[in-house]
């Protein structure tokens, strides 16, 4: 296990030394999204946000309409609270109200709920329910702006209880060591996951790298290497992700996901997105939380976002998108993916309740 983990760390450490040490935690996407990884710096006293998204979707397998995923869909009704208790203590909480069910724990709908203590400007510790440090630019995207996921992200849960130890190499480079419940953990399977992540912000070049060791059964491990890159060029942004997965014999291409994305913002109102994803697993089968053995799928598509009132306190966006998937499905693939068309039109909004209340108060008491 030790030698395999070192082999994962090598590309990460080479990336640190090659890029140089003079940057910060990775910024959001060109669309102004917040980080799913929850590893973002927050300087405000208190923020309370409420947001949701509603879509009208149509999915086809070849020319046959799929009834279950089609129609009106309410997505991601969420409330998030974050703030500073003291100069050293901060907290963050986000609840997906739409995921709270009568037959499940309230925490199943909790994305993250953590308390962080900063020892100094370099070191901090975070504990609670946290985002698993998988890395990649796609993984950083806010759930409300995830229209078409890569096949891998349809399977593992991304939020678990754990502890993060953070170290700021400079104001612009951050390392995170995480010990948390494994994404494979169930009530009958007490397993854990260990991760080293690097977040870099180097002018136009941003990195989100991670090396992971996760138990899929007690004492049995799968290894991940995630390399996420964001490149900013004026009004354009390019996101390139690579994730490698292996259990016994390491191979960079037999079990991997490669994703490329181009985002262009011609003005403050429009965001144009085109993407392509390749996913394969030719090595093993780990059941329902994984890409099935024998899969080799390619997905491409595009999204158009329109923001009629691009304000900081209230975000309103109208979106439309399309994607197509083709290739070879795995031997135990439960949901057919190849020759599948996906179309969506919808609206999303997010409101900063505290900022909006202050704005209304100030207008009434001028």
Language-model-derived ranges and their functions:
Residues 70-72, 108, 187, 293, ...:
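Aromatic-acidic/polar surface patches that form glycan- and anion
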Residues 1-53, 342, 346-351, 356-366:
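N-terminal periplasmic/intermembrane-space "pro-region" immediately following the signal or transit peptide
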Residues 145, 149-164, 171-174, 185, ...:
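Contiguous hydrophobic segments
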Residues 75, 109, 121, 159, ...:
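Exposed loop/turn and edge beta-strand positions of beta-sandwich/beta-sheet ligand-binding modules
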Residues 53-67, 103, 118, 202-366:
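Outer-membrane beta-barrel pore domains
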Residues 37-58, 68-182, 199-201:
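Outer membrane beta-barrel
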Residues 176-221:
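Loop-centered beta-sheet repeat module
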Residues 134-136, 185-187, 328-329:
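Short catalytic/ligand-binding loop motif for oxyanion handling, primarily in non-cytosolic enzymes
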């Amino acid at each position: 296990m030790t030698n395999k983990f070192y082999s994962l760390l090598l590309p990460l450490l080479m990336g640190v030394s090659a890029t140089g040490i003079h940057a910060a935690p990775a910024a959001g996407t060109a669309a102004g999204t917040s980080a799913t990884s929850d590893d973002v710096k927050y300087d405000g006293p208190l923020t309370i946000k409420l947001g949701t998204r509603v879509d009208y979707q149509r999915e086809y397998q070849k020319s046959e309409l799929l009834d279950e995923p089609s129609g009106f869909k309410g997505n991601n009704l969420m409330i998030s609270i974050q703030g500073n208790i003291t100069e050293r203590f901060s907290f963050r909480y986000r609840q997906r109200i739409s995921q709270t069910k009568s037959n499940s724990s309230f925490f199943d709908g909790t994305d993250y709920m953590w308390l962080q203590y900063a020892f100094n400007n370099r070191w901090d510790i975070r504990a609670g329910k946290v985002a698993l440090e998988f890395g990649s630019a796609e993984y950083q995207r806010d759930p409300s702006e995830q229209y078409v996921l890569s096949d891998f992200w349809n399977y593992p849960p991304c939020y678990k209880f754990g502890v993060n130890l953070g170290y700021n190499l400079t104001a612009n480079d951050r390392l995170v060591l995480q010990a948390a419940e494994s994404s494979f953990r169930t009530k009958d399977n007490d397993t854990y996951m260990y991760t080293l992540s690097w977040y870099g912000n180097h002018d136009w070049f941003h990195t989100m790298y991670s090396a992971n060791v996760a138990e899929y059964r007690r004492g049995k491990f799968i290894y991940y290497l995630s390399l996420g890159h964001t490149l900013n060029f004026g009004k354009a942004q390019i996101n390139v992700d690579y994730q490698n997965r292996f259990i016994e014999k390491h191979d960079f291409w037999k079990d991997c996901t490669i994703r490329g994305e181009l985002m262009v913002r011609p003005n403050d109102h429009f965001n144009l997105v085109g993407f392509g994803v390749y996913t394969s697993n030719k090595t093993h089968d780990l059941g329902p939380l994984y890409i099935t053995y024998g899969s080799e799928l390619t997905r491409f598509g595009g999204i158009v976002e329109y923001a009629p009132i691009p304000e900081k306190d209230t975000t309103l966006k109208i979106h439309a998108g399309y994607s197509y998937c083709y290739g070879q499905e795995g031997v135990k693939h439960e949901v057919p993916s190849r020759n599948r068309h996906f179309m969506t039109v919808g609206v999303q909004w997010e409101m900063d309740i505290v900022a909006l209340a202050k704005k209304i108060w100030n207008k009434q008491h001028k």
